[in-house]
């Protein structure tokens, strides 16, 4: 679970998400500032963990979930007629379907995808390791709390797709706009691929492995922040793995709130719209029979898709990285 401070901050932000949390933009790593890190598909135990299902939409990502439909974050925008590029092919947006209970948007395209991502339909996201994909900002200048390294500000945007890992530690109610969110925290012990999100990572797909393969469990939505080293001024967006002594903006009280200097690091993190709890809405949009000219799955993949489409299964940047603007990730 996240630290007590992180949990209380996340809940406080949940009450004000619609007013603007920082949206996400780019995958930022604890282990390295190398902008070329993790810019090719994962291999080994992470092979086929979602890279093959990432498309480009409005400068962010979109993820095919059916022959003629892809899933994205609503807050990044878009219009009918705009292009969606997937697997080297450009498709045209034909219609939008917005979820009234979350930040999700389903986009229908002209044409048919050769493959699409299976959805996670279970209820065991918490504790699961994840792989997340996004375009956006790299790691910038170091942030210190006194003499202690706390994290890094958001850097520049190189527009390159990257991937990272983390663990889902909680689900959080983000309020009427954002709905149910998966929460992952940025820590010093997250391994070589441990990451946070930033501006440009919004709409990035979050995949987990349920034992039968990698499934789409979330769509990147927002991040904790912004932060400050004092209680005045505009502050800054950052990936912070130890927020002790720093200030974080409280959208409810419209003031900087200092994070206590306790004995343990206070991690902050990112949020993704929880896909599983919106399964019935997704199923209401996607036709019960596949539409398109290319067979997408066979075997277990087809069985899983059939469960979703027939209704037998169960299921957060245009901006700045995860919950930004105080919060969403665009």
Please tell me what each predicted stretch does.
Residues 103-107:
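Short beta-strand micro-motifs in enzyme catalytic cores
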Residues 27-53, 60-77, 163, 195-291:
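C-terminal subregion of chymotrypsin/trypsin-like serine protease catalytic domains
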Residues 299-321:
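A cross-kingdom C-terminal cell-surface attachment/processing module
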Residues 2-13, 19-28, 272-273, 283-305:
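Short, threonine-centered small-residue motifs that mark membrane-proximal processing/anchoring sites
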Residues 110-200, 217-243:
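Chymotrypsin/trypsin-fold serine protease catalytic domain
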Residues 66-67, 71-102, 112, 125, ...:
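Catalytic-histidine neighborhood of serine endopeptidases
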Residues 321-330:
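Cytoplasmic C-terminal tails of single-pass
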Residues 62, 88-97, 117-119, 167-170:
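Short, surface-exposed loop motifs enriched in S/T, G, D/E and P with embedded aromatic residues
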